[in-house]
Every structure is written in C-alpha cells, then in structure tokens.
C-alpha cells in the first residue's frame, strides 16, 4: 500500500529520545467498491511568499514521504522552474475503512489477531536486540506503521505545472496553426487560456490533451501530467497492493496511521523507535543521534558519507546554476528592452558622452526608470530564493567532507549600466561589444575579436576641452573655449600676440647695468624733459626762506606724444652757501600719463622697503651735492610729469645728545638775518622711452564691437588684458595697485569715462572665462 505526502498520522512526536513515534508503514488491506464522481480544480502555489516557507520542511528534511511518487514528481517539476501547479481531478465514491481488530482489542479486551510469523519474528529478536536486528526482522518486513482508518476510492486527475515567467511570451506556432482555435500564426498563452482548457478536460478529454501538449511543445512554459489511479469502477481487489494508489486524500478525511511499536512488548518499543528513525532518516546507512537540539546520522563504516544526501545536494546546486542563468537572463532582457534601446537611439552622437552625461539622460527617462525598477524587483526575488537554497544547502553539507562553493550573484549598479551604454556606443564594431575604459578613452575587446572600437567623438567641456566637435569629423575638435586656441587637434592655452605694435615693453635693463649707468649718470638713459617752475630758475641762487614750498616740474611729453616714459631714477644737484644750516626737503609726485595735478601719486621715499635719497659730494668744498633716488627695475614706473615740492628745514646739533635735529625755520622779516642761500643746478630723470601707438590701440578696441574675423574679438581681448596687466605692473607701491591702464586710456587715447568703464568691464568678463584667471583689485587714480 502507498500513501501520499499530505497524509497525517498520530502517534508521532519530534525525533528525540525517548523514542515514542514512527513514520510510515503499509500492510495488506481490504476489499472496497467505488462509484459516483466529484470534480474540482485546485491551483497550488509552490513559490515561497514573503515570510512563508511552505516547502522548506520537504526540501531540507527527509520526511516520511520523500520516496512517494507524487512527492518525487513535485520535486522534479519544482527544480525545473515550474512554480505553479493547476490540478483538476475527480474522485470516485469514498469508502471509509476502519481497523476492526484494534477496535475489538480496545472494546472487548481481546488479543490482537497477529500473524504467527510476526509473533515468531518478535520472539527471535530476544530481550536485547541491536538496531540492525530490529531493522532486518521487523521494519524491512512489516514497516513502521499500520493503518487505523482511511478513505478508499479511485481518482483521475490532470495536473498542469506552469512557469509564469515564460508563459506570457509570444510563441511562434508550427504549421501555421494557432495554439487555441487556430486563429493565427502567433499567440500569447495566458492563465485564462489554461483555465478554460482545464475546465474542458472531463468534457472533451482527447481534444483538451492535444491542445495542452501543443502548448507544452511550443512554449516550454507548462508541463502536463495525467494520472488515473485506484479502482475506477465497482470492482473488488483481493490485494490493494496491486493498485498504484487507492488512498484518497481530502480535507475532511485523512489517512490515519499508528506506530507499530504499540503492538510490541514494552522492552522492544524504545529500541524499535530508534531503529525505525535510523532506518527512515539515515536509510539504513547509520544510526540517528540527537544532541543539543541537533540530529545527525552516525555513519556505519560501509557508508561514511551517510550524512551527505548527494541527490539533494546536487539538486540544490543545479537549482543555483539555474538561478544564475535566470539572473543573466533578467539582465539580458533589460538590455534588450524597448526602453533601454530607445535611450541608446536618443543619445547624441556629435560629442563624447561621459558617465555623468549619460546619467543625466538616464535620470530624465521615466519609462527606463520604471523598467529598471522591474529589473531590481525580479533580481530581488531571485536573490532571496538563492539565500534560501544556500541556507538549506549548507545545512545539508555541514557534516560532509566536501563543502559547496558558490558565488552569489551581484546586482549590477547604475555605474555599470552607464559604462555598458558607453561600450555599446563606442566599442560595438564587432559581433560582441567590448568594454569601454573612460580614463584612457579606449576599448578592451573580447579575446576572439581583433578590433571592436568605433569612432569616439571628441570630449566637450571647460578649459582645455573642446567647445564643439568638427562637423565633418566628430572625432576631431572643431573649436575651443575662450582662452584656448586649436593647434594640431588639441586646445592649448592662447597666448596674446606681441604688444610691440602698441606699446614696447621689452627694453628692461639688468640691475647691474642700470646701477653702473646711473652712477656714471650716462646721458643715454636720461629722459629728455622740460623744466617748469614759477618759483626759481636752474643755476640761480635763491633764498629758500622766501617761500615755504617751491614747485619744480619736469614735463616729458610736451612735443613727443608717440612715446611713454619709464622712470628709473631721479637726480637733483643742490648747492648751499658755506656755513648754511638749511637742509632741503623734497616731496615727489608722479603723474604717469598726463591730466591734472590731482591725478599724480606720491612717492613714499624711505617708507618700508622703498629706497631713500643718496647724497654724493660734487666738489671738495662740499657746497654742491647730487641727491639721487634710484628706483631700479623693482620700483620703476611710468611718468609724464614729475612734481618736486621743495621745502627747507634747519639742521642743528643737540649738545646734550650729540644728535642732529631739524626744525622748521621761522619767517624772517629782516633780510640781514638770512640763514643761507640754495641753488639747484640740474633736475634729471633717468629711464627710457617706449614706443606708443595710440591709433593701433584704438583699432584694437574697435574689434571688441566690430571683429574682423571669427576669433579676432577674443584675440583683441586677450591682447588688451595683457596690455592692462603689463601697464599695471608698474604701479607704485601700496596696499592696492593703482589703475594706470585707465589713465592710459583716459589721457593718452582721449577716451571718455564711460568708454573706459565699458572696456574694463569687457576685460573682466573675458578674463573670468580664461583658465586660471588672475583678478586683482585696483585703486582709482584718474578721474
């Protein structure tokens, strides 16, 4: 007699000592008759849902029915990926069968009618048999349980195993016939179609089976099994073992079994339970041992690997491999999806797309986002299933010599898909696309492909990157960003053209040369200028007390407007009468490019690191001295007019401290009390003159509004910025540079204030776009 995995029994507790319960037994049975019919359709979902694992006990534990044919069929289908079962069946008249012998014993206290051979085998065991003897003499002959009650009858059923992932795909039918009804060459099989076919099974069995087998062959999404078991007519059977199955399972009436140990003497019961559990759990290959909530088989020398169910382990490893294939299939289907392919077609091909650019297109595609979420949900289900199988697999293998090895599948990140898009765009010139490397802008091709790299457009960006790719060849750079110029296909920093046509600035003297020439007061470095003063004349003695301050002016550009001048030193030859106590004091103001006297800056003599006056005697009498202030290359500056304010002070010797003190002279009303006279023989400026073309600079400024050619405006701006910086470099010392360039535009080019402001704004805006822009604050000098 055979029974199915859904039967319940009594008399069995968890497999821990003391042994009080067993699992499965069949005995020769009874005669029965069947009639009447009943039909039902039962869908069963075998895929585990969240938080429920209805099949874990079947897959992990070797329960009492693991050898039942229905359980074996279920396991085979489950491992093949069929997650849902639809079953339509009908049963024939159920007959309730009870064990009258056991009832007579309980009611009438009569001895059980045990077979003489069974009694003889019990006696042969003796008082203390080992587990092997119990197994050989009792369990292998009579089983572990006997039947208390059951419902007998016949049954015929149709079972459809369904793989829902494959079911919805369109399937091309063969021979031009439709799967359902022959209405076309292509159809999609739905669950509703299967429901209709299953419902028509008992009405038109042959036609239904033919259509179902057609779907099974065409799609591979279903597996059809037809079973007809038990006595299907009103026939009598002398031996129920000749029938494949006559036990009918129903929710209201299950098969009831009782452990065989209740028929045995007290001294054999515990030993029988231990032997039965070892026989069932360890398949007679060892002895079941339970300790600290854990049970295992103590293997016999003949079967050292009894704790390793090879078939189950192999089945789980096969399931893991199938999950790996399903994982790869999910990713491949996502890559082949309409949403993913639509994004590829929508991407621009006139410029290179880095990962950041692709991520922006990805984020704006809502349909692709939804499809990507579907991919993540499907992979999450597979990941949970993988974890469940791995837990069961490691539980089964924890006492095996060989431990399983498996690499968990990993979900592909967004950065992987962005790189995959780059690979499809730029490395798809072969059958199988390669892998794009963004850092090197190259492709790694498959080993069997000599070349897979296609044309890679130029990269756009800021700074040295391209502004636009060439329209005739996107792999080449067509134009560059402001501040860069295209040279040999690359954007290189743009350098301003020479300023010699506008203002010559390349005549600097070396410090040693300059020092030597200034000491000699070489006429070659003297800047010709005109002396102007209303207070005195050169070479004439005057009374310095006549006025507190005298103005001496040197004007350089009165007749030569095509030059600008750079001052390197200023020298005065001052003579005093003998025994004079007067000391000259000079305040120097420099006007760089003309304008009013208020547009001059004060020279900070002997302040900070600025140089002081140097005095050298001209004659032995020491009546005349050369007063020289040397600016050198460090402090040189532009000048057009030099204003010298001359004052006098009285030099006296302090007897108490032996120090020289100075004080301002009082106004003398009596000429006879004169303190001495002063004479200035020479007032010279040493430096050099630079060629200056105001018309050329005006033309350069005009290009800001009316550029001659493409790029000439940028070139003009770059030259003006260079000119501005070179001019402002000669600004006098101070916390803030003076804006000498505005003075140059205002007074030498005669531009209006609004024009000067507009030019300065244009230069600042263009300079901010240049690579590594240098901005500095300037102070206003000219109005």
Curated annotation (Swiss-Prot):
Q: Which residues are glycosylated?
A: 185, 354, 473, 579, 626, 658
Q: Which InterPro entries match?
A: BRINP, MACPF
Pfam family of this protein, just one?
EGF_BRNP1-3
Principal localization reads secreted
Boundaries of each MACPF domain copy?
85-281
Q: What does this protein do?
A: Inhibits neuronal cell proliferation by negative regulation of the cell cycle transition.
Q: What is this protein called?
A: BMP/retinoic acid-inducible neural-specific protein 2
Supply the source organism for this entry. Answer: Homo sapiens
Q: What is the lineage of its organism?
A: Eukaryota, Metazoa, Chordata, Craniata, Vertebrata
